[in-house]
UniProtKB/Swiss-Prot annotation:
Chief place of localization: cytoplasm
Keyword rRNA processing: yes
Chain's gene name: rsmG
Key words, A-Z: Cytoplasm, Methyltransferase, rRNA processing, S-adenosyl-L-methionine, Transferase
Protein name per Swiss-Prot or TrEMBL: Ribosomal RNA small subunit methyltransferase G
GO function term, MF aspect, one: rRNA (guanine-N7-)-methyltransferase activity
Species assigned in the record: Mesomycoplasma hyopneumoniae (strain 7448) (Mycoplasma hyopneumoniae)
Length: 202
């Protein structure tokens, strides 16, 4: 069902490569425990949600010049949300920070097997050199207070911090003093409450 929904919503994507990516996750999950998603749920909460929410986040960026966007995905694990988005938008400049070595190895494998070009940093985001990213994002990595701390040294003015969250985001905002995140609900077709906590660094 959700595999077909992905095809219907994103007809111009490289569906063959997306299927290969899903198959690699299913195969590698047996040994590496990459994600709890499998089967139709993998297509729903892994693939569709990633592409849909990343499209939404990119829409929050003021990109009148239509420049190549530089995106950092923190703790992508098996590649969510950035890899499905990269497959559908190969023109972006993607960097992934992933500290778990087995997941890093998986990301290296998919880069080679799917011929995907992205920068992979196999260490915690706190240890990477500051770079000018247009967007810094993460999904299911940490609460807003922690995300605020670990990204503090690596963002620049005008960087968009945009984190994919569930309904608990409202409690996280209350606990993150002086963080000043805005919350927006992402209307979607998978009957799931998805929110984006975002702000532009001043």
């Amino acid at each position: 069902m959700y595999k077909r929904l992905v095809q219907e919503f994103f007809p111009k994507l490289d569906f063959e490569n997306l299927e290969k990516y899903v198959n690699l996750i299913e195969f590698s999950n047996k040994n590496f425990n990459l994600t709890a998603f499998s089967g139709d749920i993998l297509w729903k909460e892994g693939i569709f949600e990633s592409i849909f929410t990343m499209n939404f986040i990119v829409g929050l960026v003021n990109n009148k010049e239509n420049k190549k966007l530089k995106i950092l995905d923190i703790g992508a694990g098996s590649g969510f949300p950035s890899i499905p988005f990269l497959i559908t938008n190969p023109e972006i400049e993607l960097t992934i920070s992933e500290s778990m070595q087995k997941r890093c190895q998986f990301l290296k494998d998919i880069s080679e097997k799917l011929d995907l070009k992205f920068n992979l940093i196999c260490k915690p985001v706190q240890e990477i050199d500051p770079q000018k990213f247009d967007i810094i994002t993460a999904r299911a990595v940490a609460n807003l207070e922690k995300l605020e701390k670990i990204t503090k040294k690596i963002h620049f003015p005008k960087t968009l911090l945009a984190f994919i969250k569930g309904p608990k985001v409202f409690n996280e905002v209350q606990n993150c003093k002086n963080c000043n995140y805005k919350i927006i609900k992402v209307n979607n077709n998978i009957n799931k409450k998805i929110f984006i906590a975002f702000k532009q660094v001043s």
